[in-house]
Amino acid sequence: QNLAWGIGTPIFSAFAEKYGDRKAITLGLILYALGVFISSTASSPEAHQFLNIIIGFGIAGSGFGPVLAVVGRSASPEKRSLSLGITTAAGSAGQVIGPPFAAILLSTMPWSSVFEIFAIISLFTIILVPFLKSKDTSPIKKNEEKLSDAIGQAIKDPTYIMLFLGFFSCGFQLAFITAHFPAFIAEASSPIVKGSFIGLFCNSVEGLGALSMAIIGLFNIIGCILAGALGKNFTKKYLLSLIYTGRTI
């Protein structure tokens, strides 16, 4: 899924450049919802792997990449940093709500039904796409430069290489935490005692794993908004260095 996400990102970027951001995001949402929904009925490892590729391409078309590109082009230069921070924080809000909601649903229904519910919720977000500011109305002039030329210039820029390596480590860390951290919390935790402080928020160790992801998302909201606000007044490369230092620690 993550590999498909990475491979699909430049493909959807080129698609958005040619056909528009709205169409690219809509296609991404459809692929994501379709992949998640059909996964609820998949019965073999091969089918799940194939559907994970579809989901990965869906994320590439509807995730942070294309959405932040729209926001970056639409926001004025003086408000761009904060706007990007708020948008990223909104994505983290889904991490705060999604895992606990999924844990609650899993306690009352099979996982396949939970997949179907989340697929339907994802599909309904298409109604927000028409409200996106069209690329054609952006004050930035259309760039006629070929994609191959742009990539050639980028790989010669040390700043781009550093950002590339930074995002490589970021993606590894994010994928590792998402895949293993909830299970680690569930396996390492003792049974939840009724009436305890933790018991006020969840009643199972599986729910504790979901709660841990929600807590990460909550602090990510704070960090995104703070970084966006600071980016208006401070040099971004130094802020980014501090952020990566904090993540390393």
Predicted regions and their residues:
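Residue-level signature of mid-helix packing/kink "hotspots" within the transmembrane helices
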Residues: N2-P10, Q95-V96, G217-I225
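Helix-to-loop junctions at the C-terminal end of transmembrane segments
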Residues: G8-G20, C224-T235
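C-terminal ends and interior cores of transmembrane alpha-helices
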Residues: I30-S43, R247-I249
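Hydrophobic core of transmembrane alpha-helices in multi-pass small-molecule transporters
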Residues: G35, E46-S62, F168
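Cytoplasmic helix-loop-helix junction between adjacent transmembrane helices
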Residues: N52-A89
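Helix-loop-helix hairpin linking two adjacent transmembrane segments in secondary transporters
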Residues: T87-S134
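Extracytoplasmic gate region of multi-pass secondary transporters
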Residues: D157-G228
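C-terminal transmembrane helical hairpin of 12-TM major facilitator-type secondary transporters
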Residues: I216-N220, L226, N233-I249
